[in-house]
């Protein structure tokens, strides 16, 4: 089982990451990763990224863009 430090490092290495990506890279259950990401956010180590800022091109005007949003995290700046 990965530690909070490994989850934080995984986000750092990817720049931005969601629970699915971290879960896959660390071979952990996604609900566990979500809980760890939320914990790291509460500790001030990570921050949620406004996903709408990430949307570009045709995705920005897509009506389904908000339906497929997931929480994306990055290191707190």
Swiss-Prot record:
The residues the record assigns to binding iron-sulfur cluster are 54, 59, 62, 68
Domain of life assignment: Bacteria
What is the source species?
Answer: Proteus mirabilis (strain HI4320)
Q: Report keywords, A-Z.
A: DNA-binding, Iron, Iron-sulfur, Metal-binding, Repressor, Transcription, Transcription regulation
Per the record, the similarity remark reads: Belongs to the FeoC family.
* Lineage of origin: Bacteria, Pseudomonadati, Pseudomonadota, Gammaproteobacteria, Enterobacterales
Q: Does the keyword Metal-binding apply?
A: yes
Protein name, entry field: Probable [Fe-S]-dependent transcriptional repressor
Q: Gene of origin?
A: feoC
Give the function comment from the record. May function as a transcriptional regulator that controls feoABC expression.
Which Pfam families does this UniProt record tie to the protein? Answer: FeoC
Q: State any single GO MF term.
A: iron ion binding
Q: Is the keyword Metal-binding in the record?
A: yes
InterPro entries given for it?
A: FeoC, Tscrpt_reg_HTH_FeoC, WH-like_DNA-bd_sf, WH_DNA-bd_sf
